[in-house]
Curated annotation (Swiss-Prot):
Lineage of the species this protein comes from: Bacteria, Pseudomonadati, Pseudomonadota, Gammaproteobacteria, Pseudomonadales
Record GO terms (molecular function): betaine-aldehyde dehydrogenase (NAD+) activity; metal ion binding
UniProt source species: Pseudomonas fluorescens (strain Pf0-1)
Subunit architecture: Dimer of dimers.
Family, as annotated: Belongs to the aldehyde dehydrogenase family.
Cofactor(s) required, per the database record: K(+)
One biological process term in Gene Ontology: glycine betaine biosynthetic process from choline
Protein name in the entry: Betaine aldehyde dehydrogenase
Positions bearing Cysteine sulfenic acid (-SOH): C286
Positions marked as site (Seems to be a necessary countercharge to the potassium cations): D248
Pfam families (alphabetical): Aldedh (PF00171)
SUPFAM superfamilies for this protein: ALDH-like
Length: 490
């Protein structure tokens, strides 16, 4: 017996049965409990959602900027009023510690929505003089119907990061959450409707990326895809979107980010930064700094500080607010992470701590993996080359600044990077040479609503958050006005 009732699709401002009886299970990864049975959208459901979105978008775009802004601000208020309720549901569905979801997931998502709600009246064009009798003006117009495809690690936050600029610009969005974590996105759809967003402007289709995601990327009347997920899937999304109708695509993809500890760094601060860059959200953050570069002569001292801090991690029931490290998001993902850990051991990396599944007591029912630190790693090891998306830190030693910059950039990814140093001249000098779209100096992980985020190389296309994301959900129309006589050459 599932804890919650059957989860339906959300189309045209209300819950709606899918076109088939097929469902999948939402599983609590802390104990294997079936939380809910979730309906799988069909291709016909995708078409229904598009028709609904087209209708709603016309109503939404016709509203004044202040009207749209006020409605989105009401949604912000509702999100904040229901913060704890939504955070508790997110914890059940993802396994993330309530101490995290309560203070981060809904809070930061609401901040992004508030930011874009404030920018709605600021969407403006330009006036360009040509001569005394003629000028050009530009308009920023909504794209129309767009689609968002989310990842499983920050379900409601990602849904808000994508829907906030889209709706602020006057678009309608069809959102497909990850099949692994679908529950809070459906609640977000309810909140948008309650706040006054017209029916159809935010529809939610649940199901697999292979089916529902593909139908969305291929649909000829969807103008843009905003995708968060793995690099391999992102390549397929881009190919599908361009083949069907030359859709605009924004993608936030994988990473294998470097964290460089300099020889002048405060080692306590360096260790604290490395812990946040590797074990926050049980290591399931795309920007994690999993390649930690440490000067050779400081490696032993740094390792000791890391081991000390790992011992203080409070692994446990994620619903307990004292817990700060929960299970991985699913049992299949746990097996993937354990496979990488086994590979690290096989290839000669030394386990400093962790390195196994936790099975004592209540842990046996869940997808718990011990916080794991490998040292004596080399650049060619699988755990150093590939994104693990779990609580696995790899410590690498280096000798010179030139060397560490070269090695930090020796990756197909380019999502994030960081440096810990007391010398700000060095910090900027190194950061400016790192091939990464998001960089931190003496910190790790904060992504404010005003901060554009996205990757270099195979870590993404385009940016989310900041003013640039709002502009990316509009298209520019140029209009020339002639006030004088018009003379034909014919």
């Amino acid at each position: 017996m599932a804890r919650f009732e059957l989860q339906k699709l959300y189309i045209d401002g209300a819950y709606s049965d899918a076109g088939s009886d097929a469902t999948f299970e939402a599983i609590n990864p802390a104990n294997g409990e079936v939380l809910a049975h979730v309906q799988r959208a069909t291709k016909e459901d995708v078409e229904r959602a598009v028709v609904s979105a087209e209708k709603g978008q016309k109503i939404w775009a016709a509203m004044t900027a202040m009207e749209r802004s006020r409605i989105l601000r009401r949604a912000v208020d509702i999100l904040r009023e229901r913060n704890d309720e939504l955070a508790a549901l997110e914890t059940l569905d993802t396994g993330k510690a309530f101490s995290e979801t309560k203070y981060v997931d809904i809070v930061t998502g609401a901040d992004v929505l508030e930011y874009y709600a404030g920018l709605v009246p600021a969407i403006e064009g330009e006036q360009i003089p040509l001569r005394d009798t003629s000028f050009v003006y530009t308009r920023r117009e909504p794209l129309g119907v767009v689609a968002g495809i989310g990842a499983w690690n920050y379900p409601i936050q990602i849904a808000l990061w994508k829907s906030a600029p889209a709706l602020a610009a006057g678009n309608a969005m069809i959102f497909k959450p990850s099949e692994v974590t679908s529950l809070t996105t459906l609640k977000l759809a309810e909140i948008y409707t309650e706040a006054g967003v017209p029916n159809g402007v935010f529809n939610v289709l649940t199901g697999s990326g292979r089916e529902v995601g593909t139908w969305l990327t291929e649909h000829p009347r969807i103008e843009k895809i905003s995708f968060t997920g793995g690099t391999d899937t992102g390549k397929k999304v881009m190919a599908s979107a361009s083949a069907s109708s030359l859709k605009d695509v924004t993608m936030e993809l994988g990473g294998k980010s470097p964290l460089i500890i300099c020889d002048d760094a405060d080692l306590d601060r360096a260790a604290d930064t490395a812990m946040m860059a590797n074990f926050y959200s049980s290591g399931q953050v795309c920007t994690n700094g999993t390649r930690v570069f440490v000067p050779s002569h400081l490696k032993a001292a740094f390792e000791a500080k890391i081991v000390e801090r790992v011992a203080r991690i409070r692994v446990g029931n994620p619903e307990d607010e004292n817990t700060n490290f929960g299970p991985l998001v699913s049992f299949p993902h746990m097996e993937s992470v354990l496979g990488y850990i086994a590979k690290g051991k096989e290839e000669g990396a030394r386990v400093l701590c962790g390195g196994e599944r936790l099975t004592d007591g209540e842990f046996a029912k869940g997808a718990f993996v011990a916080p794991t630190v490998f040292t004596d790693c080399t650049d060619d090891m699988t755990i150093v080359r590939e994104e693990i998306f779990g609580p696995v830190m790899a410590i690498l030693s280096y000798e010179t600044e030139e060397e560490v910059i070269r090695r930090a950039n020796d990756t197909d990814f380019g999502l994030a990077a960081g440096i810990v140093t007391r010398d700000l001249n060095r910090a900027h000098r190194v950061i400016h040479q790192l091939e990464a779209g998001i960089c931190w100096i003496n910190a790790w992980g904060e992504s404010d609503a005003k901060m554009p985020v996205g990757g270099y190389k195979q870590s993404g296309v385009g940016r989310e958050n900041g003013i640039s994301s709002l502009n990316n959900f509009t298209r520019i129309k140029s209009v020339q006005v002639e006030l004088g006589d018009y003379v034909s050459v014919f």
